[in-house]
Amino acid sequence: MHATGQVISFVTPFERSADAWRKGLNSHLPSSVRVHWVRRVTDDFPARFSATGRRYLYVFQEGEADPLARSRVTPTGVLDDAAMHAAGQCLVGEHDFTALRAAACQSPTPFRRVDHVMVRRYGPFVVIDVAANAFLLRMMRNIAGALVRVGRGEWRAFDLQAALVGRDRKVLGRTAAPDGLYLVDVQYPDHFLADALDRSAGWPPGRLPPMLQHRHSLDRL
């Protein structure tokens, strides 16, 4: 799994400037993780439980595995992205997502509100874009696993809807691998982090993750 919009919070007895915290944290983090900004918040702000919405992308790449995109996408055969997009619309709205949650999920309720499901193609890349108020454990990877079955012609839109209504996790089959998963945005009430989160520069729907945009550009040459 990858993240371009992760927000975390922590409690500390130490006093440092925001820039000192950012530089200090980055000096101890592995090269694959970077802190972009730091802000002081009130005591009633836990980053996880204050969030009002989250957005994930899942990226499949058709054809043979690309060594330059290794661990950043999930390789697959040819997909019908239009069929995947159409099938995904049955997930929009508030539903019982028992069929799409992992057995180890500890959420007290299986109900979640999905705001949009979009599937778009960028050359060999097929991107699934889902926004919701919250996600159950492995819910996004299970959505990707179900939609790829539609894309391969193994399922129709009706089959996904029937699985959702039937609330049977076993019907969906395999969970998609973590490689193609990206957390791209976390939403908060306006009074939290208003000066840090630039909503006008939000992630455009269905956009390809930055680390894959160069691959798409090369394919179009």
Give the predicted meaning of each segment.
Residues 1-221:
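Structured-RNA-binding interfaces characteristic of tRNA pseudouridine synthases
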